[in-house]
């Protein structure tokens, strides 16, 4: 078990004394160490009679004895306060060593009054076995009263807002878009959950098109057939223009202004990180945007009309937009309780909306926490001129997602009024996204947030799994690289798939975000010493490290051929039985592919030295095929039996994370380190007619040519003599169209290479 603390802010001794005093620990530097220990235990919500101090004495006996307090005894007691079990989790007499091996913060100095006070201060900042830092656990046990006012410790807000007194309101915000050209601004339903307090509250907002319901049946009916032949394309240049939808002005009309919303709600999905912030004095707002249940408009799916329907909420919080108590617009309501400062949170589509909102430069959005977000929708459903489904969802496309999230049709009355217009616009979207060619076009350009990163004002916090093949790592990497030089940004890169990380045991993620949001949303100093990149190591249990950047400038080139004359060949076509088997279950195909049982060329490379990949690996291939159209798929494995982190978190303890005071209890989880025969490092796909994004070229049969394309970016450490397995093939039954033509691909390995960005030891 190893803990990684990134949320702890260094404080001088006077600051420590002042903060401890506010918690009720009022100590003098003239007290001896044992008196301070005794008072610490008396003031705490723990029962000191349960604690063991030495191999022979419990704490009560120790305090009565003449034995002096030393660091070993301190850690015997401290570990128990952190929920470690003496004689089982750790050995009495070896507590200091156990704490050091667990990476717990320690004072490496002699035992003095000042040092023991500092030790208790940092102990309160330390993670318990259950994943909560000690001070937050004790506050949840009643260390401070629920007075609905802010209390801070180590630059973090504590859970002193009463979750039993939360206000829950439903409002309709007037957006600056008319997504169906009705001649009226679309109204957007929002749900607000906020503490009952006289304080002016900041907002943690989650923009989720899923929030008010999804239409699974419409989604399934809209799925595209993947068993189709690749289209041959005429050579041409692609032209796009940068444009944004014009914002509409609201129609001014004087209305009565009320203080309270008549509509309330009781149930609904909430993000547990937002719940955590609720009890710490941050309001939560959930907004689903245009084309969703009880709102107006069409589900425009990723364009700036959808984004503006989300940022309208931030405008309302800052007095620049209007909100109403009902869709009838008879009464207006102001955000008089809000301080106007907003953070956006959420994973996947939710993180995507955060990226998009940030690129509008909307005033009041101070920071985004974009988890597994999409920065360019083309790169989610396409790759290098090829239709490429996101991992786990073959046949999905943006029109399918629109059908899923157009939740207005879930209400019968709205279905009657709006379905005909919806069907017309959905058909237009299907045509515009152009599955036939797979090329970039104006439709996708309008859904590319990367071209507007120069407008970003908010601080950017990125969370992404390097084993996420749904929303692939390039989405985070590209946004990271596109931000202007010097922009405030940090990335948390974990080894999981498409998952949240705010309830993991090994890292104080929620507390780190707490310190960041407190500074940005409550006008306090940002003293958090956060590195640019916080990386979970790929072959160690519960180890996180710091890096300077995502993407290295140094490269090495590994030739794919072992001799001067070296060729590889694979066929595209499968017999009917195999084709049907793989089409039915792409996981069967993936297993066969990784074990060299599919139609593929496999090149195994033994590494001559240790290296860390940092960025997108590039393939440079010399090849030919016996057709005038074709596509290439590539995957690279870390091949060979060894321990690696799984990409799915496992529960370590149930319902032990208290988000407030017995509020929204959450499971403690972690990625396990397990034996495995291989692990996917990266993969990529390309249409051989698309050597760059905006050019389509002719492909000549039986003629050699060279192509270069990047695979997904990653950071991955490999040891000397580790084996890289490079897999080259055509049809991928999870991602690409299932083209079963009889095409043979031949690769000149002697003229082909792997170009790897590598991390310097210094970084």
UniProtKB/Swiss-Prot annotation:
The protein's name in its UniProt record: Xaa-Pro dipeptidyl-peptidase
Quaternary structure and partners: Homodimer.
Keywords: Aminopeptidase, Cytoplasm, Hydrolase, Protease, Serine protease
Locations listed in the record: Cytoplasm
Function, as annotated: Removes N-terminal dipeptides sequentially from polypeptides having unsubstituted N-termini provided that the penultimate residue is proline.
Domain of life where this protein originates: Bacteria
A Gene Ontology cellular-component term: cytoplasm
Gene Ontology biological process terms in this record: proteolysis
Residue numbers annotated as active site: 348, 468, 498
Reactions it catalyzes: Hydrolyzes Xaa-Pro-|- bonds to release unblocked, N-terminal dipeptides from substrates including Ala-Pro-|-p-nitroanilide and (sequentially) Tyr-Pro-|-Phe-Pro-|-Gly-Pro-|-Ile
A Pfam family: PepX_N
First-tier enzyme category under EC: hydrolase
Family: Belongs to the peptidase S15 family.
GO molecular function, one term: dipeptidyl-peptidase activity
EC number: 3.4.14.11
InterPro entries: AB_hydrolase_fold, Galactose-bd-like_sf, Pept_S15_Xpro, PepX_N_dom, PepX_N_dom_sf, Xaa-Pro-like_dom, Xaa-Pro_dipept_C, Xaa-Pro_dipeptidyl-ppase/CocE
Main localization, broad class: cytoplasm
Gene3D superfamilies: 1.10.246.70, alpha/beta hydrolase (3.40.50.1820), Galactose-binding domain-like (2.60.120.260)
